């Protein structure tokens, strides 16, 4: 019997055919994972993966992230019996003590096989989120001290931008006004901004992730946390009691800071967020 390599193919060999399909699937899975992991806004600190419950939560800065992290950490310790938030993983990584980090294999599995998981996230009115970012990072920063994520390069860049465009806020130790902040954001590309004020559809990677449910911060935060925790095996009674305690509250600026001009600018920046998440473009009044 002679072996004709030119006429031999996987088509007539079920075993080889299966191997080829399996290899193709592995490459496809890898591409899916890299498509997410390579994003600017992907971070394990913003992703809760519970493989056992087939549940993934993508956190969205300025949309209840600190509250959710605190609740998740408490739930893992008090209800799920974890020895620490991340079950001892990443011992030298301080953040892993304050948020449940999964194993690398579990992150890979979730994004390689997304059809096996339910994905969840929270969104917020773009005007409210934008105002909150400025108040928390700049108004309060100017008054009480800038957070680590703002002082240094980012603050210098904004002051340099203000100077080159003859806008207020360029002088060191002065407040960066909301109007200058919005203009600075407007000068940057979607997906390239700081995650606290970048467009939410980029932060949440909606083009790559199919969400089972998207909860609005306005009126759906408690419902969302309760539903997600229920999937993790956490009783509603525990979640309800845990959420009765005050959540993370930043110092607020109660007066309205949006003008029609600034609202128009913000509406243009966050146009897709308004459309995708169903927010009213005229909801800026009073903010």
Enumerate the language-model features and the residues they cover.
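Membrane-interface amphipathic segments in extracytoplasmic regions
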Residues: 2-287
